[in-house]
Regions:
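NAD(P)H-binding glycine-rich loop region in Rossmannoid oxidoreductase-like domains
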Residues: 43-85, 94
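Glycine-rich NAD(P)-binding loop of the Rossmann-fold in SDR/ketoreductase-type enzymes
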Residues: 46, 79-90, 133, 137, ...
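N-terminal Rossmann NAD(P)H-binding glycine-rich loop of SDR-like oxidoreductase domains
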Residues: 4-24
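Catalytic helix-loop patch of NAD(P)-dependent Rossmann-fold dehydrogenases
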Residues: 82, 118-160, 189
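Mid/C-terminal beta-alpha module of Rossmann-like enzyme folds, strongest
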Residues: 204-267, 273, 278
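Conserved Rossmann-fold NAD(P)-dependent oxidoreductase catalytic core, especially the SDR/UDP-sugar
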Residues: 89-136
Length: 285
């Protein structure tokens, strides 16, 4: 990795990537619509002139810029298409024209949509790369559309692209009112690390590993999440008695929650990042 363009450099992940690359002595250009100390180019993704200028001399692109799930209530579907689909197309086309060696596209486990949600009172779902997405909202729909454009760019004109479907890494509180009312934020995040959350530092290392491997992979897609103590054999019990499974698989965490008098939140899914670890050589903290 010789020179990197990070889109969305004013965001949580984009800033972390720019900080890490800069600290490692890698030349990096940050591009975002919002100014920040980590953003050198303030421009929209669809500003092709600004994008071409930012791509001069760039060998790898880390494309994190996006409208997120919390924006569903404040932005139109067209806004999502403009940023997440048209913006990604612009990044892919201009990257190919600039001779970029590899692009890493930050997708989301939200792309799985309704496939994430088990039947009422049913077992938790096991989520890996074999699960077929079922659309739930415009965020997931535009992420899967952008992923398709990434695969198309890998086929023609042959731009190496790695898609990372990342689980939760944002510091904000859960966006579901009923969940926030039933559980405190610390408890939610601690348990989520067992099945649907990842540290932002590990998301950074996954992007850097993907950038290094992109030229030889051509196109690939991975789930990126923290290692889970849960197993496939736990899924039925996770759906009915997550506290019992937590006590068995993560006894220290179960004891901490019991000591604090905190109930164990529901566990409806388990993300499996094994393929990313095996194929990217991704190491996690």
């Amino acid at each position: 990795v010789e020179r990197v363009l990070v889109t969305g450099s004013s965001g949580h992940l984009g800033e972390a990537l720019v900080r890490t690359l800069t600290g490692d002595g890698v030349p990096v250009v940050g591009l975002d619509r919002r100014p920040s100390p980590w953003t050198a180019v303030v421009a929209s993704l669809t500003d092709r002139d600004a994008l071409r200028s930012a791509l001069r001399g760039v060998t790898h692109v880390l494309h994190t810029a996006t409208l997120h799930k919390p924006h569903v209530g404040s932005h139109s579907r067209q806004d999502f298409v403009d940023t997440n689909v048209s913006g990604t197309l612009a990044v892919l086309e201009e990257s190919a024209a600039a001779g970029v060696r590899g692009v890493v596209f930050t997708s989301s486990t939200s792309a799985f949509g309704r496939a994430l949600t088990p039947a009422p009172s049913g077992p938790a779902t096991w989520i890996d790369e074999t699960v077929v997405p079922r659309v739930r909202n415009v965020y997931g729909a535009t992420k899967t559309a952008a992923e398709d454009l990434c695969e198309l760019a890998a086929l023609d004109p042959g731009l190496p692209v790695v898609v990372l479907r990342t689980s939760r890494f944002f510091p904000e509180a859960d966006d579901r009112d009923d969940v926030r009312a039933a559980h405190d934020d610390t408890t939610l995040k601690l348990v989520e690390f067992c099945h649907r959350r990842v540290d932002v530092a590990d998301v950074v290392s996954a992007h850097l590993a993907a950038a290094r491997r992109a030229p030889e992979l051509g196109f690939a897609r991975y789930v990126v999440s923290a290692p889970s103590p849960f197993r496939r054999s736990d899924l039925a019990e996770l759906g009915s008695d997550p506290a019992a499974v937590l006590e068995r698989r993560a006894p220290a965490l179960a004891a901490l929650l019991a000591e604090r008098g905190r109930p164990v939140p529901p566990v409806d899914r388990v993300y499996c990042p094994d393929r990313a670890v095996a194929e990217l050589g991704w190491t996690r903290s």
